[in-house]
Structures are given as C-alpha cells and as structure tokens.
Amino acid sequence: MAEFTPITIAYGDGIGPEIMEAVLYILRKAEARIRLETIEVGEKLYVKHYSSGISEQSWESIERTGVILKAPITTPQGGGYKSLNVTIRKTLQLFANIRPSVSFYPFTKTLHPNLNLTIIRENEEDLYAGIEYRQTHNMYESVKLISRTGCEKIIRYAFEYAVKNNRKKVTCLSKDNIMKFSDGIFHKVFNEIAKEYPQINNEHYIIDIGTARLATKPEIFDVIVTSNLYGDIISDVAAEISGSVGLAGSANIGEHYAMFEAVHGSAPDIAGQDIANPSGLLNAAIMMLVHIGQGDIATLIENAWKKTIEDGMHTADIYNKDHSTKKVGTKEFAEEVVKRLGQKPEKLAKADYPLVTKKQESNTTYKINTKEVKKLVGTDIFVGMNVASAHDIADKVNKLDIGNFELKTISSKGLKLWPRDTRFETISDHWCCRFMAKDGVELKHLDITKLLETLSKANIDFIKVENLFEFDGAAGYSLAQGE
C-alpha cells in the first residue's frame, strides 16, 4: 500500500482560495500520495487580532507535517501587523528561497526566449527581518543584520544546487561598494566558498548593474545567489520577463521544514473572478512533490501543464492572439491540465524527476568564529535634539566631564557635520555623537554607562547606543562621509 505524506495546506487570501482549489484538483486527479491538513492563516486571523496572521493550532499542524503548501496571503499595510511569510520563514528557519524562472517561448510572450535561471535568496536576515524603530519625531530606522554563518549557509547551498542540477555558473549580487560590512561579508564569503567548487564558474555584480543585466540579458545568468531584499526584488523581475509572474513558484527550504508557494501576491483586485493563473502555485506544488520523493507525480503534472501551455490554453495574463488557442479561467485551466495527464510536451523540455529525491544536505558545521580579538574602542551615542547645528550639541557636550572619552565627530544620516570650519545648518533632530577612547585608555562598559549618566543629567536625550569595536585591530564600524 502506498505511503501518503501529510501536507499542511493554507488557502490564503485574495485569489489564494481559487488557485489552491485548482491545484488540489490537479493533485487529486494525478493521484498524488498526500494527506492534507488545512489551516487558516492570513487576513482572517489578522482581523481576529493575531498580529502574526497565524494561530497556535496552525503552527502545530506545520510542525507535525513538516511541509506546507501555501497560497498567497494579504498582509495589512501600516503598523501593528507582521508579514506572515517572513514569520514562517524565520520561525521554521527556512534559510533558502529557491525561485526558478524559465521562458516558455513561443507559447508565452517574452523578449527572452532563452531565459532559464534560478535565484537562490537568503531567507532569514537582512532588512527583510523587519526590525524597525521610530527614534525621534522626524527619524525612522530599519536595521540590516547579516551574519557570516547565514552567508555561508546560503552561498554553499547555491553552489551545491548548481552541482546537483548540472548548472555551470553561480553569480553573486551585492552592494558592497557602499555597505562594506553587511554586503561586504556576503561577497567575501562568496569568494571563499567559490574556491571549493572549481568546476562551477563564479562571478559578482553590484546589485544595480546586475539587476539591469538581468532585465535586459537574463540568458547570461544561470544560478544567482543574493541576500533577502535584493532576492525578493530580482526574482519578481525574472518572473515578469519570463512571460508572467503568475507562472513562477518557489521553495523555502530549511533543515527540518519546507514551504512551497507562488511568487506572486494575493491580487485581491481580481479575486473571485475565475481569471487568476494557478500556474505559480502549481509549479510550487511540483517542487513540493519532488521534495517529498514523489518525482513520478511531479513529472506527470509538469508534462501535462507544459502540454496545456503548448496547446494554447491560456489564462488572461499570458493570453496572446499569436500563440493562444483559447482564453480560459482558473477552473477551466485546471481541467485542461487534467485532460493532458499522461501526455508530454512536444517542444518544451520534458520533465523527468527521480522517484526518490535525496535531500540536499551539507556536512559543514556552521560555527561562530570567536578567535578574533575583540576590543572596545569607543561608542556612537545617538541623540534626539531639535537644534539648528551640530555645533550646538558639541558646545554642550564639551562643557561636560565625559571621563575616558573624547568627542570625535557629530554626524547626521552618515554625514559628518562637526567639526567643520563653518557652522553647517541641517534639518535634523537625530544626531550621532562618536566618542572614542582617550589615548592609552582601555575602555570598559562601565565607562559607557557613566557617559550616558552624564549626558542624561545634562538633559541630552540619548536614543540609541552602538558600541565601537576592533577585531584583530581592524575597525568594526564605518566612518561617516567626510570623517
């Protein structure tokens, strides 16, 4: 008797329920060996005051099955709500987001008939973590966190993916010409790990020119690895130029759990009209079937889907008079795929997945390097003061006894404004005061707390503290522009 794999299903919001019904219909007709557990997430939970969009009962189902197929959800805009996608990815430690983009030319309209690439996006870190603060009346902050171990995991995964899938090149995208620490470590780790895979070509682009090349010459790319926010943006670019965002599915992979979803959003403006393309979620389901070792069913469905595309049965988003035979709705598209189960495409590449898929694993143990000598050399204290000039703050601070520190610079938004030859006025209530240790002084954390107490007594409103360290003598902090 065939073994059935338990799968958690989330219908989502907007067009989610109708495309999920279409996909489940195809899975049933293809006799996928799965047992479904349905959970409620997204908008219905948000209105019940679940700020994360998911309940404890839903978590229990995901933890029980280990695999979730999720339709798009709607995250309410504005404060008070957290993205469910980000919450699931981070909670389940789904560190790798895999997003293939393939052209189905001439059956779908595209300027790039040879497009065939995969974007591997880091899934847990970066600005996408959503760590944000309002610090003053005027200033808002979003924190970008990148770890060496996070870089190592995703970059090694990308090279292993290239090896496993007979890819020839891995391209890294970053902005390390500006963000020399966060994006800098991503690029540095890429260069280190690339040396371990001499059979795979490697290259690096700055994200802006890399995105431009992706939009105009996508055929030059094979596998792209990048950080979270960049990956989110460029994967939509790749999906769009392939013919339709509605065709792209994605996998979110961790050590113990996996989530599969369409790349596109919930599109509430077309919900309930039976016009949405279910292909993105269907392709995600195909990736899920491969992941759980049902490559035979994945092959059956993908070949039927490609034959449907070849035969011109197209939803509105990809319909064109040159290669489309009939404009079909969501339900009819699913029915057309089912009619072609057992058939194979004639021009598009035929799918042929192995029955049992070996999980992509790494024997590497990721550890934090603590061998570098870490030395406290100063502190950046951010203050909230509505003054016309940094000189006003400097005049006030320099009248105080600041112990083992000396005030080196005052900056705003990364631009040094003191000391300068002239009093430069700027509109700001958010200032960074850089205090460095006096010559010959070995700083302790107690020195910083004393400094904060001194500032507080002087009615200087400190709003944030960033301590400055050297690691093996190298500065672990950036300089302000002009410093």
Swiss-Prot record:
It comes from the Bacteria. GO terms for biological process: glyoxylate cycle; isocitrate metabolic process; tricarboxylic acid cycle. Mg(2+) binds at residue 232. D-threo-isocitrate binds at residues 83, 85, 89, 99, 121. Its cofactor is Mg(2+); Mn(2+). GO terms for molecular function: isocitrate dehydrogenase (NAD+) activity; isocitrate dehydrogenase (NADP+) activity; magnesium ion binding; NAD binding. It is an enzyme of class 1 (oxidoreductase). NADP(+) binds at residues 74, 264-270, 277. Its EC number is 1.1.1.42. PROSITE patterns: IDH_IMDH. Binds 1 Mg(2+) or Mn(2+) ion per subunit. SMART domains: Iso_dh. Keywords: Glyoxylate bypass, Magnesium, Manganese, Metal-binding, NADP, Oxidoreductase, Tricarboxylic acid cycle. It catalyses: D-threo-isocitrate + NADP(+) = 2-oxoglutarate + CO2 + NADPH. The record marks 128, 175 as: Critical for catalysis. InterPro entries: IsoCit/isopropylmalate_DH_CS (IPR019818), Isocitrate_DH_bac-typ (IPR014273), Isocitrate_DH_TT1725_C (IPR040978), Isocitrate_DH_TT1725_C_sf (IPR046997), IsoPropMal-DH-like_dom (IPR024084). Homodimer. Belongs to the isocitrate and isopropylmalate dehydrogenases family. Catalyzes the oxidative decarboxylation of isocitrate to 2-oxoglutarate and carbon dioxide with the concomitant reduction of NADP(+). NCBIfam families: ICDH_alpha, PRK09222.1. This is Isocitrate dehydrogenase [NADP]. It comes from Rickettsia bellii (strain RML369-C). The lineage of its organism: Bacteria, Pseudomonadati, Pseudomonadota, Alphaproteobacteria, Rickettsiales.
